Each structure stands twice: as structure tokens, then as C-alpha cells.
Regions:
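Central antiparallel beta-sheet cores of small beta-barrel/beta-sandwich binding domains
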Residues: 10, 17-87
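Beta-sheet ligand-binding and adhesion/scaffold domains
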Residues: 2-6, 28, 64-124
Length: 124
């Protein structure tokens, strides 16, 4: 990854809020950087209030967007919550923070695994 890629990745830093205030999924995401490392934390929506997911290390990925020739960086963060694993890809697309979530259930609940995509804006 080049220095320009890392610089562009700084645009991912900060606290991001879901554009859909009625989401039943992820309500916010925080991306942080310490040295050469990245971390991602999520807050989910629960019946009894916010559910804070553990902060995890993130792996930087090159994100070569075909639309408009964008070249940015994305992050891969995997959350293991015991009963489920969520592989999360976060990136910016034309100024909109996008989370793509691949959820695999690890328990015997019979729930279907799923894919979800949500959109976020930077907290002012």
C-alpha cells in the first residue's frame, strides 16, 4: 500500500452515524488509527438499547472502485460475538461511508446467514 493510500485512508477516521435512524442493524461505527494499525468499533441496535460490539483490529485493503475511477482504501474487520461472526468491510464511496456486513450464525438457532449494506455520515 502506498503512502498516498494511507493518506486517503485518514478520511475513514472518526465516528460515523447511520443515515437510517430506524435501522435495526448498526447505528454507528468508529474508525481509529494508532501507528500503522487500524481499529473498528460498532454499536448495534437492541430491543433494550444500544449494543456495543468489541473493538477489533482492521486490515487495510485496496479499494479500486470502477465507478468514476475512484481509488481509495477499505478496511476489513471481523467481529466474533460467539453466537455469530460478522465480516465487515468499510469504505468511502463518493463521501458516503458504507458498511457491508456478512453475518454467519455459529449457534444452532437455525437463523439464516445474511448480507447487509448500510450507509453512514460523519458525526458533525
Amino acid at each position: 500500500m502506498t503512502q498516498a493510500d494511507v493518506h486517503n485512508a485518514d478520511e475513514l477516521l472518526g465516528r460515523w452515524l447511520n443515515t437510517n435512524h430506524e435501522t435495526r442493524g448498526i447505528s454507528e461505527c468508529t474508525v481509529a488509527r494508532d501507528g500503522d494499525g487500524w481499529s473498528v468499533s460498532l454499536v448495534g441496535v437492541g430491543e433494550d438499547g444500544p449494543i456495543r460490539w468489541p473493538t477489533v483490529r482492521a486490515t487495510p485493503l485496496a479499494n479500486v472502485e470502477e465507478e468514476a475511477g475512484q481509488k481509495t482504501m477499505a478496511l476489513l474487520a471481523t467481529f466474533d460475538l460467539g453466537f455469530m461472526r460478522a465480516e465487515t468491510h468499510v469504505r468511502l464511496n463518493k463521501g458516503v461511508f458504507v458498511i457491508v456486513l456478512f453475518v454467519t450464525f455459529l449457534d444452532d438457532s437455525g437463523r439464516a446467514n445474511y448480507l447487509n449494506r448500510e450507509f453512514f455520515y460523519r458525526q458533525p
